[in-house]
Amino acid sequence: MLEKIAEVQKKLSKRIVEKEVRMVSKIAAVDVSYKGNKARVALVICSFPDCKVLKTKVLETEVSFPYIPTFFFLRETRPILLVTKGEEFDVLIVEGHGKAHPRKYGLASHIGLILGKPTIGVAKKLLRGTPENSYRKVGKAYVSVGNMITLKDAVRIIEKLLDGGYPKPLKLADKLSKGKISEDENTLPSDKTS
């Protein structure tokens, strides 16, 4: 079964578009945490480039697919689509790889293809077999194209959002998804790392 899914990933990777993103005023970031089969997904929308938090949203849902490296998109797509539904943003930052993936089609690419919006993949570690020209290291983050953005634009956006080596909206989404802060706490202290 996974072999067939891997083939589908390879085919879908050919549908990923890289293009310049010019007007960016709202950035969204999304992260998912788990307790057993329960997913807690957090969305943070902030202004760009000053990163003032405009909205936060947290949802919980059941997931049925287990964590399998390089097939992360099968586990996280549904929670991310639920939390982003009806929300407005120019670019979405996903905690997970985009083209920095052995089959050039990670979670950020899958979400970008479904939403039809520019997406950036951001991760703390590389996957084994990742093509070298598919990412850039920015601070502590491995940044890659999800969909509808160039690597140059993705890097430029992430550089402006860095806080302690990682994009501030993604750090906030991580803390929200893990319940370390509540939705009412819509700021993240600067110079603190998670």
Swiss-Prot record:
Question: InterPro entries, per this entry?
Answer: Endonuclease-V
Compartments it resides in? Cytoplasm
Q: Which GO terms describe its cellular component?
A: cytoplasm
Q: Where is this site: Interaction with target DNA?
A: 67
Q: What is its EC number?
A: 3.1.21.7
Where mainly located?
cytoplasm
* GO-annotated molecular function: deoxyribonuclease V activity; magnesium ion binding; RNA endonuclease activity, producing 5'-phosphomonoesters; single-stranded RNA binding
Binding of Mg(2+), residues:
31, 95
| Catalyzed reactions per annotation | Endonucleolytic cleavage at apurinic or apyrimidinic sites to products with a 5'-phosphate
What family does the database annotate?
Belongs to the endonuclease V family.
- Name of the protein in question: Endonuclease V
Organism in which the protein naturally occurs: Pyrococcus abyssi (strain GE5 / Orsay)
Question: Gene encoding this polypeptide?
Answer: nfi
